[in-house]
Amino acid sequence: DAPTRLRTAAIYMQDQIKFGQGWTALAGLRYEKSRQRQDDHVKNTSATQHDSDVTGMAGIVYEFTPGWSVYASYSQSFLPQMGQDYHGNAFKPETGTQWEAGTKYARDGWTASAAVFDLRKRNIAAADPVNDGYKVLVGEQRARGLELEAAAELKNGLKFTGAYAYTKTEVTRSTNAREIGQPLNYTPRHALTVWSNWRLPQMPALTLGAGVRYVGKQHGNSAFYLPAYTVMDASVSYTHTNWRLTAGVKNLFNRSYYAGAVRTGVVSPGMPRNFNVTLKYFF
């Protein structure tokens, strides 16, 4: 009932420079423009929107000892949005900025990284609380947090990987004053993934894998939360000269959990125990 046509075009340039002892700098610019037209056959209205923006990014890395470095980066984003509100106005593009700083280590089979970030997004389209089936732009959202990752290759064919994310979110500007200061819906504050592989010494072609996924409590709205959950996965793979066969199972113990929700009373159950088989051929 409301077909939309969106056209975008962009051009960008980027440069990386190494200088001094262990320093690397990266910078770039991107120009993007968009044209959107939507015809609402129900309300007999049309809207055309032209948008353009120049975004930039910059980063610097310093390797202060072999395999160990620190870095900082800044980036901007520009994302055209399809659709229009109840009054027939086309949506403005979503824009954002992100700061990130951290450290990375990679040496002798060990890798690790730690990073802090601060992300802000503006002109976010969300469900219209008054007119069902429509969306409105709600202002600004902010996400700050910490990300940790590590991997290690040990003796006897063992390999471990792990990742943890702490994310604090909030609505910083909104057309609905009650939303300001509230966390974003369906964004867990804590998330953890751990995975291990074991290549059998007696059968090097055979690899066993197992891991755990944890997702913390998620804010639905002022009325409810989705509870935290933990699920376990496992796999077995056989590798030949130029192919690999893998069989896996997700949610090994068939735990019931909720992965998301549309609104109060309409939640999405997580996937029950499920199996998959993949075959990869290497050229």
Predicted regions and their residues:
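Signature of Gram-negative outer-membrane beta-barrel scaffolds
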Residues: D1-W68, L79-Q81, Y86, A163
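Repeated loop/turn-to-beta-strand initiation elements of outer-membrane beta-barrel proteins
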Residues: G22-A25, G67-V70, G109-S113, G157-F160, ...
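Transmembrane beta-barrel strands of outer-membrane/channel proteins
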Residues: A27-Y31, V70-Q76, A114-D118, G162-Y166, ...
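C-terminal beta-signal and adjacent terminal beta-strands/loops
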Residues: Y214-N221, S237-F283
